């Protein structure tokens, strides 16, 4: 991001933490464990993300996924001042009750 007097960059670690906290705010959802659980692209004022989730067994998967998409998009837009083009969610695991 270009600002008056220089540029601002958001590290991958910071983006990961923003997404992790947004996902954690949705009841019944968590990021899947492992290295390839999420990817976030931030370019020229636009962002997109792909997340691999674990969802609590018995929850309505489309509802939980939609809530995650909304929270992640809101967090990235608010904290990084970007337009979020897409948040892709893949439910990879179900957690036992």
Regions found by a protein language model. Name each.
Residues 78-95:
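A short amphipathic beta-strand at an alpha->beta junction
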Residues 26-54, 91-94:
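Short edge beta-strands and adjacent turn/loop segments
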Residues 53-57, 76:
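Beta-strand elements of well-folded, non-transmembrane domains
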Residues 53, 62, 86-88:
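Protein-protein interaction and targeting regions used for scaffolding, dimerization, and localization
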Residues 61-80:
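Short, non-transmembrane amphipathic alpha-helical segments
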Residues 2-38:
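N-proximal, solvent-exposed amphipathic alpha-helical segments enriched in charged/polar residues
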